[in-house]
């Protein structure tokens, strides 16, 4: 194995950047060339079919089978112009990845010959095996039927020679088995709730759209080094490895010069993104060595989420071409920053108003404050649901590690905006407001744009920060599907806005004027949500103590955090807003707990194998060298001198023996703990057992191995070390 390590280093030293050439010097010449967007639809579809598609996208109007046939035929004609041979229904099962089954256009004609055909029926629906994907017990193996159904709001696209049709994935009995179905429901729920609130201010607003701008962080590692680390290959992270003498402490990687091989990879990634209509805009070095980021311009949430799933697939495929492997695990290396996926979330009206941006007048600012304050209340009431949406076996290693937001949910507004909310509380009383009081309050509200111009600072330790015209949810992990957090946030926001509107309307029914009713409920909401507002250092111990005093939860136990998917508040949101039914919600919990269990189980097995079959033999081989050295010393030197000269080696032999014995004992104990957990029939008990009885062994075993790495001869150490993984370019 040590030979493989040095062979990998030798191979890496001979790598050269690949030459990458864009199809044209003008981006607009090829942007969206592989997407069946509206421009292509106009070209390839009859007028009635084009109108039917646009009505379906904008108004939700159903598409008839006859029209579907016309659309399918036009889509096939366009795809054939790109040399496409197959089509697939592209969907997002509960695996945190995507799935696809490729079918050819080939069919037998009436004369027995072969023809190419793609019908509306094939476009609209297919039947993959639902029992082979995570389903939380909804589908048994003998109940395999599931359906994929075309999501007309997300355009079809071409990858290589395959036409990909974005779809939802449901069971034969109608339960959602994917991320897209509940995401679309959550977006519809917040659209309706937000529109109803907007109409208190402006009757011209008839729709509210959710926008998402994600920031994808990732690590790159040379494929030779990757293949020489079985833990990276099988788990996505290093289960062992002593910290490099130099890592990120000099802060010289962030925004630094991008290495040539990485630049070539990034260029090709951007070209492929742009062909697929993904508006990739920003690329840069991140904080940790060999860590990078890609960020696009924000888009409609559903499309943005599809694009993020596409980007993660593209990264893996293109990286291999450049002799890299992409690491999307949240914490592939201990001791340096992990990777997140910031979700920049905003709500915009069909009249062009960003509801999280201050208006141009007091009325516009009242609308802004209404949505700002309700967002705060949403986070406060649903902190456990938001945490559950981002909690996983991998993300837990990142949260609160002085690099990412803590597991405590809080909101950062900036001191000036917080003061504005406090001023509203001070000025709004319980009695009827005088015209003068209303004028004073509205004048104060009118100053908000000036306040935000210079004083909306950025607090990198805040999990849910207001950044001037959006909220940035920073707790989501780099490998996650954005839909998980977007479902939680949008469903919870819909629930909160519905409550707000009902409270305002109740006061209006009692004879209170509309403006005053809004101010009174805003005041109540500001006071109630005050514990969630925090401007300080989210990494500090003082904040943990203060958060506890405020009643904010801090759950770092993964299964315990996930169990909050089915607490009363989460049910009132997810079931109450009709995002899930009871069966679907329970199945989601089961899937997440089973995923957690399996990931820890795999890590335990891989670490046990590497420890016993790679590390222990290497340590014993080195120990034997030392013993041979001692025998040689004893033959040459007198007894008294021998004792002095051999003391350090004897101590090292003793240390290695202690470490080897400890590793063997701990691996044996971990294996027994896994066996006990595996025999538990209840998936909840099994997950808790893996969290409490199995996972702690991973760090204990690692500690002994990392010490051995610093004691054993570098020439025989079998696995690439951190300095090689992180600093070889």
Label the model's feature ranges:
Residues 2-24, 132, 141-154, 162:
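N-terminal hydrophobic targeting/anchoring segments and the immediately downstream early-domain regions
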Residues 14-120, 124-140:
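Histidine/acidic residue-rich metal-binding segments in metalloenzymes
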Residues 67, 91, 119, 296-298, ...:
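Active-site proximal loops enriched in glycine and acidic residues that flank catalytic Cys/His/Asp
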Residues 67-71, 91-93, 121-122, 169, ...:
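Active-site-proximal loop/turn and secondary-structure-junction residues that shape catalytic pockets
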Residues 96-112, 131, 229, 236-238, ...:
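Short linear, low-complexity motifs centered on an aromatic residue
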Residues 143-328, 337-340, 347-590:
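Glycine-rich, acidic/polar active-site loops that bind/position phosphate-bearing ligands
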Residues 232, 308, 330-331, 357-361, ...:
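Composition- and surface-driven signal marking solvent-exposed, interaction-prone regions
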Residues 525-729:
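C-terminal amphipathic alpha-helical interaction region
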